[in-house]
Amino acid sequence: MKSILEDIKTQNFKQAYLLYGEEAYLKHQYKNKLKNALLPEDDTMNFSRFEGKGTEIPKVIDLAETMPFFADRRVILLENTGFFKNKADALADYMGSLPDYLVLIFVEEEVDKRNRMYKAVQKQGRAVEFARQDEKTLMTWVLGMMKKEGKKITRQDMEDFLEKTGTDMGNISQELEKLLSYTMGRDVITRADIEAVCTTQITNRIFEMIRAVTEKKQRKALDLYQDLLALKEPPMRILFLLARQFNLLLQVKELLAEHCDQATIAKRTGLQ
């Protein structure tokens, strides 16, 4: 991410950028930062966008070969094309001879690092992963936004807020906006405010169900199950998520019995 910001700051751009990973909010932010730095907002003549797995490579190449109209650059944005998991040999070949005026921006959720397109972008530009952020990073980010609005919150209430919203930054941003509007005119955000306006995510209800089951709180577990059904969550998915979490708990218990350290447990269970 810092490399993209440095390119924008120095105005020394690469010819290809790949933004990939699970954190859609950050990908969206950096996609727009790049686009706005490369072209004026109203320059629609030199900006083109392709989306989806039906994107036709010959059309992309034809457009790429078109000189920019009264501008220094032509920018082509390609989103969720699947080119980085499936074969896209014609485009991978073309990556070796991009016109000087061209900048390609690819946005994908999943990539195969053995893929020719991934290697081509690495050679010609930058491949940047936008992974889910850890709790410490999210907490710092949210506190920064609260501070700008003159708001204060205790650490415990901040943890409750993140537990309620989950780790998706897009959802956190939306819930925070609701919270800031609700507490307008007050300096301190409380747990009562969070409970009043913030929506609990489905995955968090799953964790609450697990806690209720392990604590033998049958009524609470059933209430949470009904909440999930009301949210149109399929019963088989609920069962799958519960089974997966209990399986993880069992693995952790067994590894602790073997006196494994936290790093080993994280590696073996895939919780890194």
PLM feature segments, named:
Residues 1-272:
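Conserved beta/loop motifs at nucleotide-recognition and modification sites
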